[in-house]
Amino acid sequence: KDGYLVGNDGCKYSCLTRPGHYCASECSRVKGKDGYCYAWMACYCYSMPDWVKTWSRSTNRCGRGK
């Protein structure tokens, strides 16, 4: 599946201050095919396994505590 990587806090992986290869590395770490820093804000990955958590507007819990 494709989507934004999500951390344990429910927030998208930020890439604003990261090196250019950061997102591609993080995506491959979770068995994704490739990834990039979308609009310099968050990591977007391609072809990840279904078990990888991705961000969704309907299940967004970033900034809402646990």
From Swiss-Prot:
<dbReference type="GO" id="GO:0006952">
    <property type="term" value="P:defense response"/>
</dbReference>
<comment type="similarity">
    <text>Belongs to the long (4 C-C) scorpion toxin superfamily. Sodium channel inhibitor family. Beta subfamily.</text>
</comment>
<keyword id="KW-0800">Toxin</keyword>
<dbReference type="InterPro" id="IPR002061">
    <property type="entry name" value="Scorpion_toxinL/defensin"/>
</dbReference>
<dbReference type="InterPro" id="IPR003614">
    <property type="entry name" value="Scorpion_toxin-like"/>
</dbReference>
<keyword id="KW-0872">Ion channel impairing toxin</keyword>
<keyword id="KW-1015">Disulfide bond</keyword>
<dbReference type="InterPro" id="IPR036574">
    <property type="entry name" value="Scorpion_toxin-like_sf"/>
</dbReference>
<dbReference type="InterPro" id="IPR044062">
    <property type="entry name" value="LCN-type_CS_alpha_beta_dom"/>
</dbReference>
<feature type="disulfide bond">
    <location>
        <begin position="11"/>
        <end position="62"/>
    </location>
</feature>
<dbReference type="GO" id="GO:0090729">
    <property type="term" value="F:toxin activity"/>
</dbReference>
<feature type="disulfide bond">
    <location>
        <begin position="27"/>
        <end position="45"/>
    </location>
</feature>
<keyword id="KW-0027">Amidation</keyword>
<dbReference type="Pfam" id="PF00537">
    <property type="entry name" value="Toxin_3"/>
</dbReference>
<comment type="function">
    <text>Beta toxins bind voltage-independently at site-4 of sodium channels (Nav) and shift the voltage of activation toward more negative potentials thereby affecting sodium channel activation and promoting spontaneous and repetitive firing.</text>
</comment>
<keyword id="KW-0738">Voltage-gated sodium channel impairing toxin</keyword>
<feature type="disulfide bond">
    <location>
        <begin position="23"/>
        <end position="43"/>
    </location>
</feature>
<dbReference type="InterPro" id="IPR018218">
    <property type="entry name" value="Scorpion_toxinL"/>
</dbReference>
<feature type="disulfide bond">
    <location>
        <begin position="15"/>
        <end position="37"/>
    </location>
</feature>
<feature type="domain" description="LCN-type CS-alpha/beta">
    <location>
        <begin position="1"/>
        <end position="63"/>
    </location>
</feature>
<dbReference type="GO" id="GO:0005576">
    <property type="term" value="C:extracellular region"/>
</dbReference>
<keyword id="KW-0964">Secreted</keyword>
<protein>
    <recommendedName>
        <fullName>Toxin Tppa1</fullName>
    </recommendedName>
</protein>
<keyword id="KW-0528">Neurotoxin</keyword>
<dbReference type="GO" id="GO:0019871">
    <property type="term" value="F:sodium channel inhibitor activity"/>
</dbReference>
